Amino acid sequence: MAKLKYNIPEPLPTLLEEKKSLYGLRTYISLFSSAGVGCYGFKQENYHCIATVELLERRLRIQQYNQKCIYNSGYTCGDMTAQETKDKVFEQLDMWKRNYNIQEPDVIIATPPCQGMSVANHKKGDELKRNSLVVESIVMIR
């Protein structure tokens, strides 16, 4: 299969500073992103991170070190069940829609913890709250 080519002028940081329209820009949002390892391939393929959410600050710092998002405001350390966390993601999306003429992100990566559903985790107690993060992802994406 032939690789699609997008006409995105470089360097991107200069375009962002000039606030030019970036028609054709490929974007994504990452929920439950841990240290951002799962997003590495997207970055390699010139996708741009609108927002990333991780519960643990130390994992989010690794993403920042690797410059996953263009804007510092794209990094959110928070609980995906909290409305404040969801609002931050939607604020970033709205900013990209206004400034860079995107309609919606091309990809939404949602990798909620699945320990409660794992056979290997049969000895742990009720994991209903953690398992409900799958539902939280679906509701947010709608």
Residue ranges of predicted features:
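Conserved active-site and SAM-binding loop architecture
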Residues: 1-142
